[in-house]
């Protein structure tokens, strides 16, 4: 399949978006999971980590708890990342297609689409985050995902899996709106034709992840505290904020910022580049049909994927059309038209068929005019 055909393919097919999103989500979390474990350990208050960077934290985990400690709990992420990211990207693309019909403001479109995608994604990923972070904690007693789920449910009930859901939404709504807006911004600047361009997808994804992660780190610290506590004594964002401030001061809200940014940059780069690749690849398998994300109905092949148009772009097109019409009108009035030319030819032809008379025949050949020599011999 030609790369130039990428944006004319059925890029909003629900099946394509869900499949590409699931693969991208699993690959992202599997590759970056060890660094995510380091981030969780640096943000944890039990035991408190002081003046520890990424390298020293990772070294301590491996030395004290074994080589496989940084990847414990990865299976929970794999189980949750697939369906969560599948619905995440499908909801984003579907909402973006729908809102484009009602607004021409691009950033508003991205914000609304990102918010809807986040609500659906977090409803699925919140329980897996709790399991993952419990297994990432220092001296965690859990050796498997199943034992972790059973123990949490037995001791704390089902609500423990959604204890930080509100905080997670408060964190992820601004995170994802910044994420999607930044990604689409760099796409519009670096990839004007919106074609399949792996370097641009990776660069835009990395920039989006870095910006979103840096801004929302304090909320991530609060979420980590709520997810990792076993007693459930700390309830809500306000109480968690007070506890963090009391134990670590103002800087406690920014613990693990470097690890979070370094995690998010490659993670989002991997996620977006993988998603765009599989969307590009899977579209090529059914390039002649376009299935709407909203209705699911098949339509003829989509001519082009066009971003929501702004008022400035529409005004420019209108001015161009008006200029073309003006030039056409001026040409018709200033130069002989094909109609006038054909009329002149018709008139000349009629003159050639009329009988000879006093009127001069413009088509009379010079041989028809007799010379004096010829007139002398005429009878």
UniProtKB/Swiss-Prot annotation:
Q: How does it sit in the membrane?
A: Multi-pass membrane protein
Task: List keywords of the entry alphabetically.
Answer: Ion transport, Iron, Iron transport, Membrane, Mitochondrion, Mitochondrion inner membrane, Repeat, Transmembrane, Transmembrane helix, Transport
What SUPFAM superfamilies does this protein map onto?
Mitochondrial carrier (SSF103506)
Using the record, list the residue span of the signal peptide; answer none if the entry has no such feature: none
Q: Name one GO cellular component term.
A: mitochondrion
Question: What are the subcellular locations of this protein?
Answer: Mitochondrion inner membrane
Q: Where is this region: Disordered?
A: 357-379
Q: Which domain of life is it from?
A: Eukaryota
Give the UniProt record's GO annotations in the biological process aspect: iron import into the mitochondrion; multicellular organismal-level iron ion homeostasis; spermatid differentiation
For this UniProt entry, which segments traverse the membrane?
Answer: 14-33, 73-92, 108-124, 164-183, 198-217, 256-275
Give this protein's Gene Ontology molecular function annotations.
ferrous iron transmembrane transporter activity; iron ion transmembrane transporter activity
Spell out the PROSITE patterns in the cross-references: SOLCAR (PS50920)
Family matches, as InterPro entries: Mit_carrier, Mitochondrial_sb/sol_carrier, Mt_carrier_dom_sf
What protein name is recorded for this chain? Mitoferrin
From what organism does this protein derive? Drosophila melanogaster (Fruit fly)
């Amino acid at each position: 399949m030609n790369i130039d055909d990428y944006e004319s393919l059925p890029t909003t097919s629900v099946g394509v978006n869900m499949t590409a999103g699931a693969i991208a989500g699993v690959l992202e979390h599997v590759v970056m999971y060890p660094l995510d474990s380091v981030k969780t350990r640096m943000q944890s208050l039990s035991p408190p980590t002081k003046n520890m960077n990424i390298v020293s934290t990772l070294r301590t985990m491996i030395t004290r708890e074994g080589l496989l400690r940084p990847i414990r709990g990865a299976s929970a992420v794999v189980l949750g990342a697939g369906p969560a990211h599948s619905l995440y990207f499908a909801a984003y693309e579907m909402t973006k297609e729908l809102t484009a019909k009602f607004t021409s403001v691009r950033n508003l479109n991205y914000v609304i689409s990102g918010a809807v995608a986040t609500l659906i994604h977090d409803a699925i990923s919140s329980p897996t985050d709790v399991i993952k972070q419990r297994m990432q904690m220092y001296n965690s007693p859990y050796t498997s995902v199943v034992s972790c789920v059973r123990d949490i449910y037995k001791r704390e009930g089902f609500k423990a899996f959604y204890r930080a859901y509100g905080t997670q939404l408060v964190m992820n709504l601004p995170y994802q709106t910044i994420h999607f807006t930044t990604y689409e911004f760099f796409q519009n600047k670096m990839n004007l034709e919106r074609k399949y361009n792996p370097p641009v997808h990776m660069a835009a994804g990395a920039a989006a992840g870095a910006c979103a992660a840096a801004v929302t780190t304090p909320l991530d610290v609060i979420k980590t505290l709520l997810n990792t506590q076993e007693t459930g004594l700390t309830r809500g964002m306000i109480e968690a904020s007070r506890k963090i401030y009391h134990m670590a001061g103002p800087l406690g809200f920014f613990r693990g910022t470097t690890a979070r940014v370094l995690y998010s940059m490659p993670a989002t780069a991997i996620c977006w580049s993988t998603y765009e690749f599989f969307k590009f690849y899977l579209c090529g398998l059914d390039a002649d049909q376009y299935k709407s994300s909203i209705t699911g109905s098949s339509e003829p092949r989509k001519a082009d994927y066009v971003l929501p148009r702004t008022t400035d772009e529409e005004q420019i097109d209108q001015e161009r059309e008006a200029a073309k019409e003006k030039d056409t009108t001026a040409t018709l009035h200033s130069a002989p038209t094909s109609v006038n030319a054909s009329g002149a030819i018709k008139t000349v032809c009629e003159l050639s068929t009329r009988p000879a008379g006093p009127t001069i025949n413009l088509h009379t050949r010079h041989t028809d005019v007799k010379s004096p020599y010829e007139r002398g011999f005429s009878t």
